């Protein structure tokens, strides 16, 4: 069977008690299926102290863990602390296919990727997460949407390399929207722009990336159905005390 680590990185000052129900469910689920569960402080690695933004610091933390602690070729499921398991019969490895190393999923209510990921601890996976963490140092002076805004520009560049070189007017437009963004509406417009650039595909075997369509990923926002769930659900996001 595959070696899987579920990773939750808590920001300095946040308390496990705020997420007790979600974390309890993760602890029970990990024990049930033999997954490694790591709940860590984002101040653990000196190498990540350069990150002033706690959201990017989490991805630096993931990268350092991959380099220093987790087995090569093992898998990491990175989730927020407020994600809880509601159907423990579902397995993380059921989302994994041989030709893909990086998995994201689409949120329901807009064009957004969730900033949670399943990926492999190999050179490709480490390169991808380091690129994302390091985007903190090239953020535009705008309402940029922190790591989630950056993720969409990263994925546009990653999946459509011509968007980096200036060969694409749509790619340039997405970048300009981001650089001039003033509020969440502008961030959502930028995200929609990047998705237009990436296209209607879910599978990118040439880049070893798979994006799960709405409702097909491992988690969804709890508020969508007023905290109710079905047996089709696996994990719910936004479970707070």
Residue ranges of predicted features:
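N-terminal anchoring/stem segment of glycosyltransferases
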Residues: 1-74, 123
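A residue-level signal for conserved active-site and pocket-lining positions in enzyme catalytic cores
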Residues: 30, 82, 117, 151-152, ...
């Amino acid at each position: 069977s595959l070696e899987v680590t579920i990773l939750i990185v808590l920001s300095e000052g946040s308390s496990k008690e705020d997420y007790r129900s979600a974390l309890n469910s993760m602890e029970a689920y990990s024990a049930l299926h033999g997954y490694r569960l790591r709940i860590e402080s984002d101040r653990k690695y000196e190498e990540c102290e350069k990150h002033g933004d706690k959201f990017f610091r989490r991805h630096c933390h993931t990268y350092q863990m991959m380099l220093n602690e987790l087995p090569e070729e093992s898998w990491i499921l990175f989730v927020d602390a407020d994600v809880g398991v509601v159907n423990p019969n579902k397995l993380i490895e059921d989302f994994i296919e041989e030709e893909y190393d990086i998995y994201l999923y689409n949120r329901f209510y807009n064009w957004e990727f969730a900033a949670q990921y399943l990926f492999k601890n190999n050179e490709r996976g480490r390169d991808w997460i380091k690129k994302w963490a390091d985007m903190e140092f090239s953020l535009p002076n705008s309402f940029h949407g922190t790591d989630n805004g950056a993720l969409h520009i990263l994925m546009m560049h990653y999946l459509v390399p011509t968007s980096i070189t200036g060969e694409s007017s749509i790619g340039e437009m997405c970048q300009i929207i981001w650089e001039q963004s003033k509020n969440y509406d502008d961030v959502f417009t930028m995200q929609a722009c990047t998705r237009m650039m990436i296209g209607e595909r879910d599978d990118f075997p040439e880049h070893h990336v798979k994006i799960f369509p709405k409702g097909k990923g491992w988690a969804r926002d709890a508020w969508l159905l007023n905290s109710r769930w079905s047996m089709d659900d696996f994990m719910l996001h936004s479970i707070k005390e």
